[in-house]
Amino acid sequence: MRQTKTGILLANLGTPDAPTPEAVKRYLKQFLSDRRVVDTSRLLWWPLLRGVILPLRSPRVAKLYASVWMEGGSPLMVYSRQQQQALAQRLPEMPVALGMSYGSPSLESAVDELLAEHVDHIVVLPLYPQFSCSTVGAVWDELARILARKRSIPGISFIRDYADNHDYINALANSVRASFAKHGEPDLLLLSYHGIPQRYADEGDDYPQRCRTTTRELASALGMAPEKVMMTFQSRFGREPWLMPYTDETLKMLGEKGVGHIQVMCPGFAADCLETLEEIAEQNREVFLGAGGKKYEYIPALNATPEHIEMMANLVAAYR
């Protein structure tokens, strides 16, 4: 019997190719055109997207990207490549490809890369610890579209999420402990997750429950009292209600109430990116300190730390 050759596809959101208005516009157009992300009627959405949002947002967002851009590219791309390379070293018998839902490298190029390695089984690991239709669902949709055009389809194992995975929770807990040891234990640990429209949750997306699961498990692993850990949601877009409480409004409220020292972690981000390094580490720091807070530290994403790579290796090992 022929032995199965398994490959790994690491999937993430994506990034512009450069911190320029043109590159950001291309990226945002693809991202905001996905019905998994924005499901508004196309008749209403296309004119708004092309005539208002892209022309106005692209130059402003490009400046934000420029403020965090690294020598090797955007932070998300740099850390994602490091994850890919480290996991390939950890599992040398399994080819590892990186694909993004939007931008380059595409999910299609990642699938083709693995098929060129003659794999007959692909383990797909979307690097979103908490499932959402707008992230993991988008990976599923694109993967199905890609494979629908193939004459031969490999076996697929699709990891839905890992919100309560033991290795993931331990890696987060150790990262928090290291931050506490460096900066002192704060008055409050704030866990900020990317938001989604409240309507998506009302219609069945269990993302908020998965975020609560991670929050509960992490607080338990740290032995912290529930009142010392708070869960919020960031990066809202548009006018309709998103999951609450909002991170920025919560930080303002806490500063005004006299909370002096806060540390913020974003457990839903497997790699640091614009939303963590600029929005959380910079913008929201200013919000908290401006409202009266005294100390504010951002705890980095797990990125390509050894514990994170070991977690990924253990996660996919069951499917090899």
From Swiss-Prot:
Q: Which residues bind Fe cation?
A: 194, 275
State any GO BP term from the record: protoporphyrinogen IX metabolic process
Per UniProt, subcellular location reads as: Cytoplasm
A single Pfam family, by name?
Answer: Ferrochelatase
Describe the outcome of a gene knockout. Cells are sensitive to visible light (which is lethal).
* EC supergroup of this enzyme: lyase
* EC annotation from Swiss-Prot or TrEMBL: 4.98.1.1
The GO terms this record gives for MF are: ferrochelatase activity; metal ion binding
Q: Which InterPro entries match?
A: Ferrochelatase (IPR001015), Ferrochelatase_AS (IPR019772), Ferrochelatase_C (IPR033644), Ferrochelatase_N (IPR033659)
List each coiled-coil range: none
Reactions performed catalytically: heme b + 2 H(+) = protoporphyrin IX + Fe(2+)
UniProt main location, coarse? cytoplasm
Q: Does the keyword Lyase apply?
A: yes
Give GO cellular component annotations, separated by semicolons.
cytoplasm
Enumerate the UniProt keywords alphabetically: Cytoplasm, Heme biosynthesis, Iron, Lyase, Metal-binding, Porphyrin biosynthesis
Q: In which pathway does it act?
A: Porphyrin-containing compound metabolism; protoheme biosynthesis; protoheme from protoporphyrin-IX: step 1/1
Q: How does it assemble?
A: Monomer.
Looking up PANTHER family in the UniProt record yields: FERROCHELATASE, FERROCHELATASE, MITOCHONDRIAL
Q: What does this protein do?
A: Catalyzes the ferrous insertion into protoporphyrin IX.
Supply the NCBIfam families for this chain.
Answer: hemH
- What's the protein here called? Ferrochelatase
From which source organism is this entry? Answer: Escherichia coli (strain K12)
